[in-house]
Amino acid sequence: MEQFKGLQKSLYIWTDSADLDKRVEQLKTATGGEVAVENVHRLSFSSYANSSFDLIVIECAQLTDNYVKLLHMLKPSGKLHLFSFIGPASSLLQEIKLSGFINCSEGTDTLTAEKPGYETGSSARLSFAKKNASALNVWKISGDDEELIDEEDLLDEEDKQKPDPAGLKVCSTTGKRKACKNCSCGLAEELESEKQTATASENAKSSCGNCYLGDAFRCSTCPYLGMPAFKPGEKVQLADNLLKSDI
């Protein structure tokens, strides 16, 4: 007990009342301070405040569920001392470490541990979290003297003119009306439609042979209906909509 000399307030947790006064007196003599006494079975019902003791001594007990409570009852850097304990020392050391104690050491039938030098749940500022002073100064720059730019001045008269829809097609940039291989602007479909119309016009033939004489000799479905008479064999250009279905 000489290593605990000078500790002001201690708690002695007992299991056997025989010679209890003698053991408590020995602890008082060793520490030179005040000693409180508590039964191990009544510890869970006690109402000790946090950071109340510099030293807690446990006699002949294995407190599986109360080591965390003892950690709160100790002051920062407070000591926990077990002697004549029950069970293997390795198991007790593991339970004590998992409860938050540090600097655990094993002696002859004794175990000693220490609470960290800070209060449970406390926080500390991290050194690498310092903010760059130059970055902070950027936000201090005053913008009162800055003039706002008129949005209308950013556009020229040419920018305000509407573009030609034909020029918006990607394929028209080549100068010749030719669709790209993977055309997606619609020019390929447009050229294909014009090609089919022209082919149909070239292949248009008269079934009755009287189309060139005029409307008086033409059928009701004649593609030349409404057109003036023409010479036999003469090439006549039909309108695009004449060869398309009305449905």
Swiss-Prot record:
Signal peptide: none annotated. The lineage of its organism: Eukaryota, Metazoa, Ecdysozoa, Arthropoda, Hexapoda. GO terms for biological process: iron-sulfur cluster assembly. It is found in: Cytoplasm; Mitochondrion intermembrane space. Coiled coil: none annotated. A motif (Cx2C motif 1) lies at residues 208-211. The keyword Iron applies. Component of the cytosolic iron-sulfur (Fe-S) protein assembly (CIA) machinery. Required for the maturation of extramitochondrial Fe-S proteins. Part of an electron transfer chain functioning in an early step of cytosolic Fe-S biogenesis, facilitating the de novo assembly of a [4Fe-4S] cluster on the cytosolic Fe-S scaffold complex. Electrons are transferred from NADPH via a FAD- and FMN-containing diflavin oxidoreductase. This is Anamorsin homolog. It comes from Drosophila persimilis (Fruit fly). Belongs to the anamorsin family. Residues 129-160 are annotated as: Linker. Its cofactor is [2Fe-2S] cluster; [4Fe-4S] cluster. Residues 208-222 are annotated as: Fe-S binding site B.
